[in-house]
Regions:
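N-terminal secretory signal peptides and thylakoid transit peptides that target proteins
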Residues: 14-34
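C-terminal helical cap and adjacent loop that interface with cofactors, partners, or active-site loops
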Residues: 29-34, 38, 68, 260-273, ...
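N-terminal Rossmann-like dinucleotide-binding module
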Residues: 33-105, 265, 445-448
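A structured beta-alpha segment of the ubiquitous adenosine-cofactor-binding alpha/beta core
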Residues: 103-134
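Beta-strand-loop-alpha-helix segment that lines the small-molecule cofactor/substrate pocket
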Residues: 130-131, 138, 142-193, 207
Length: 448
């Protein structure tokens, strides 16, 4: 269900029992028509159009990352406007919209009839824009991207792009259609837009380290606070609000966080692993922290025989590191996210300092909107989807305790993300009698 923010839904109105479906359909048709009418004279544009033409932006998912992406999109091109927003929850929508209005003023042109709340809100927001920013929990990303491509919209997809192999395949299929339509597709791997990372990769590919033997990636950061349940929340609403701690919504920490380091390793190797094995667990269970592991240690193997050793650790009080390291036959390269110094040691040492304050989150949107304006080739979907799949394969290995082959993982039909039609639907995972959620057990949990 989708309802314009601030408007009563059919369940809140005094109507006969036979009326809800008709009334909901009427509301959706009326709100969409009103929203479209209010944009008359503000024409849709495609790729490579005159920069004088304004670009209309829609934001789907108004939380912190979504509002951040909208802020960067508006900063990337001065002739853009945010014209529609959608979110599951009215409070999240309002908070994100208020923050954007405070910074960008009348460039945030989103009256109430273009604020959409509910499961289907994305459809109405996407229809009103030239460019869409997809920043909900990643279980919804495949469906949202499919809709954007169907309607011919350029799209920014926050990472990860899916929670399971069926979702990855859906994204790749939609990406093929996007390419045929000359749509620009960006994925939120901002490190690929950092000058220091780009230069380091160029040198590694040029042979400055000799043959790459292995890479290491760390995403060891403190645990964020879980959401305390309120009495008025249904089980599904609670999980959607506390999405970070449920694998069907976030894909688990290894996919949501370590994915950046995994993507850097794939970039270094110029391909994707053929298999993975490893382990993970949850050290301390709590009702507020869902059904995720809090640490992983995975080894991925590439076709060349090179390895990626990855760690993701969210346990409090443990060693923290967000870094990538590349070891070759003739040297070593160290990537420190957030620092401005990049270095290679070994036979051909090198060091580079980049401008302090470089913001890769902004750079990725600068590059994206430049490609739209100039009709440049721009498609980050392939590595966006396949680096997501690499991370999912690592999660499969930890959950199962098995060696997981790429081909089997990619072909798997086992899904974490059910189709949700309403927040009244049953939740995909339920707490046990002690209030704790069941977690995977290596050696017993099936992942293929």
């Amino acid at each position: 269900m989708c309802t314009p923010a601030g408007h009563p839904s059919h369940t809140q109105m005094n109507t006969p029992p036979s009326a809800p479906l008709e009334r909901r359909a009427f509301l959706l048709r009326s709100s969409a028509a009103l929203a479209a009418t209010s944009l008359t004279g503000f024409p849709m544009i495609g790729s490579g159009k005159d920069a004088v033409q304004p670009l209309k932006i829609a934001l789907v998912g108004c939380g912190g990352r979504g509002a951040g992406a909208a802020n960067q999109a508006l900063a990337a091109d001065s002739n853009t406007k945010l014209v529609a927003v959608a979110d599951l929850f009215p409070d999240k929508l309002s908070a994100g919209l208020d923050a954007l209005k405070a910074k960008h003023g009348d460039r945030v042109d989103v009256p109430q009839e273009r604020q959409f709340v509910g499961i289907d809100g994305y459809k109405h927001a996407i229809a009103l824009a030239d460019v869409v920013l997809l920043a909900t929990p990643c279980s919804f990303r495949p469906a949202h991207f499919e809709e954007a491509v169907r309607l011919g919209k350029h799209a920014f997809l926050e990472k990860p792009v899916a929670v399971d192999a069926p979702g990855v395949r859906r994204v790749l299929a939609a990406a093929a259609e996007a390419k045929a339509k000359n749509l620009k597709v960006a994925v939120g791997f901002q490190r690929r837009h950092k000058k220091g990372f780009q230069e380091m990769i160029r040198r590694i590919h040029g042979g400055q380290l000799g043959e790459v033997i292995y890479t290491r990636a760390f995403a060891n950061t403190p645990l964020r606070t879980g959401l305390v349940r309120k009495p008025e929340f249904s089980e599904l609403e609670y999980q959607c609000r506390n999405w970070y701690y449920f694998s069907w919504l976030s894909a688990d920490f290894i996919v949501d966080n370590l994915i950046h380091g995994i993507d850097i390793s794939n970039w270094v190797h110029g391909g994707y692993p053929v298999r993975a094995h490893g382990m993970g667990a949850l050290s301390e269970r709590s009702p507020d922290y869902g059904n995720l592991f809090d640490h992983f240690a995975i080894e991925w193997e590439y076709a060349s025989g090179a390895r990626l050793f990855g760690e993701c650790d969210r346990r409090p009080g443990c060693w923290a590191s967000v870094t990538n390291h590349v070891v070759g036959s003739e040297g070593k390269a160290d990537f420190f996210d957030g620092r401005e110094v990049y270095s290679i040691t070994g036979k051909r040492p090198w060091q580079m300092k980049t401008e302090r304050g470089e913001n890769p989150y902004q750079s990725e949107h600068d590059d994206f909107f430049e490609a739209i304006r100039k009709d440049l080739p721009y498609d980050e979907s392939d590595y966006g989807a396949k680096s997501t799949m690499t991370a999912i394969m690592g999660r499969m290995a930890a959950y199962s305790g098995k060696i997981i082959e790429w081909d089997a993982a990619f072909a798997s039909d086992r899904t974490l993300a059910p189709e949700i039609r309403s927040l009244a639907d049953p939740a995909p995972v339920l707490p046990e009698g002690n209030g704790l959620y069941p977690i995977p057990v290596a050696g017993k949990t099936l992942v293929l």
